[in-house]
Curated annotation (Swiss-Prot):
InterPro entries from the UniProt entry: Ribo_uL30_ferredoxin-like_sf, Ribosomal_uL30_bac-type, Ribosomal_uL30_CS, Ribosomal_uL30_ferredoxin-like
Matching HAMAP family: Ribosomal_uL30_B
Residue stretches spanning the membrane: none
CDD domains named in the record: Ribosomal_L30
Any one GO BP annotation for this protein: translation
Gene that specifies this protein: rpmD
Single Gene Ontology MF annotation: structural constituent of ribosome
Subunit (UniProt): Part of the 50S ribosomal subunit.
SUPFAM superfamilies for this protein: Ribosomal protein L30p/L7e
Protein name: Large ribosomal subunit protein uL30
Pfam families according to UniProt: Ribosomal_L30
Family of this protein: Belongs to the universal ribosomal protein uL30 family.
Length: 59
């Protein structure tokens, strides 16, 4: 299964609580931090919800 490299590009300051929780659940705390996750439906859904805050690369 493919892996996704997810980077937080924009701050969560001033964002709704559900977006903050989603970013935190992805494992991101600080801007420009990068995490790697397996590519599955749950992760894709979270990325879709905060797509304006993150950038995604396939590995």
């Amino acid at each position: 299964m493919a892996k996704l490299e997810i980077t937080l590009k924009r701050s969560v300051i001033g964002r709704p609580e559900d977006q903050r929780v989603t970013v935190r659940t992805l494992g991101l705390k600080k801007t420009n931090q990068t995490v790697v996750h397996e590519d599955n439906a749950a992760i894709r859904g979270m990325i879709n919800k905060v797509s304006h805050l993150v950038s995604v690369k396939e590995q």
